[in-house]
Amino acid sequence: MPVSGLWFEQLEVGLRVQHATTRTVTETDNVLFTTMTMNPQPLHLDAEFAARSQYGQVLVNSMFTVALVVGLAVPELTLGTTVANLGFSRVDFPAPVFIGDTIHVVTDVIEARRSRSRPGTGIVTFEHRGINQRDETVCLAVRAAMMQCRPDPGRPDPGRPDPGRPDPGRPGPGSPEPERS
């Protein structure tokens, strides 16, 4: 798996990332997530019920929203460099998400320290903000993650090919030709 995330040393307090990927939420997203998580809330599933609510339409499941917000942050921030998600200290939904809303994410690094118990790792606290096309914040999530430190120069990076080591799936020089049938 390629590593495009940032190493612990690159995740300095004050770093702000405006993530490139956006996502328009579909009815299918909402129905699948809501039913897979066994949440029968009619605000998420019943258009007639939701039409009579203060919102006048179906609300997207808020747990889908937080999952989407964190997921949209992965490619530029943590892909291949996260050891573990440690938890959320805050999750707020200041505005609802509706079918057809397009979400983009801005992430700030608000804390970073080396792990005291796991050498080669650090603990980073991220503040992710999901923002819709009307520039309304729809989700604010503060989470801590254990992140890999940059590997030693003498060791290959995890997830990146080591040019000095043959790929076990490909024959190298002097290897017998594979049998052909």
Predicted regions and their residues:
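HotDog/MaoC-like acyl-thioester-processing domains
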Residues: 2-13, 93-102, 106-181
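Conserved interaction-surface patches within small, structured recognition/assembly domains
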Residues: 89-91
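Hot-dog-fold acyl-thioester-processing enzymes
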Residues: 1-87, 139, 152-159, 177-181
